[in-house]
């Protein structure tokens, strides 16, 4: 029923990665499951990370938090991004923590009935995204929110170069430490270390680490983590081409001799971008070049040895790492997996076997039909 293209998410490996990272940082773990757990499926990944010992889950927006609440998750949830002050009643009702990031937001928040709202103060130490830039602004926000009977649950910042620039990371940390130590109040949650910083940056100001991409075994520094996600497709047709035959839109590939070309059901509508032309995939012991332009729904590969229809093709995984694919595309692993669309089925391995196989588009179609 599904197109034969799927992302495989190994929840066992995600659990083991989190346990290992918790041992490294020796602090509370905030599992960052933004953007549907980076496209891997927040509902299932949440279950795995909580069983492995995560004490809090962080998401990007209110709708992401409500998805987890509506699925029955009662654990601590933190929204890292901006929220509307008008949504405060929803945040309080569902016990969802939010980020206070500007004086303007605080003024709007205290005009609401924000008693009992769980708040984390965001300190902008150099990312220049959201957050308070001065200690005076930070204290003013704290005083106003505390006076409004908000629960001042946490304070945090975000490193912009933890994977590449230790000097800038040290500078950001110094600013954050100064901000934290300027309070006589003890925040229950103090966090600054992201995935890469957790693996190498030792500090004693924070009491929690935010783990995101490293859950999936992707880390600049910690090479012992297990890659937990892979992408596969299947051969749907094999063609024997002759010299001079062309392949794909624009006829950008011409066969030089008799060649074997196979078609896979994956294209740029699945998030497999056109820049993949010329890269290689792995099929039945051979690396096969992607030839011709990547189409919306399909792509063609050149085979040295013929394979049967339904042969599984690895886009990234054991033989082609996600990091290698990202390097070849001049991007980052985050972007590749977040771009994988809802057309791509998610297959979940847990307790060493396939536990779930989901395609949200088909499930929505079935639900709509049932409602009629």
Named regions from a protein language model:
Residues 2-11, 15, 64, 83-85, ...:
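Active-site anion/phosphate-binding pocket segments in diverse small-molecule metabolic enzymes
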Residues 24:
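Conserved PLP-enzyme active-site core in the AAT-like
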Residues 5-9, 13-16, 27-182, 186-191, ...:
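Active-site-proximal beta-alpha core segment in soluble small-molecule metabolic enzymes
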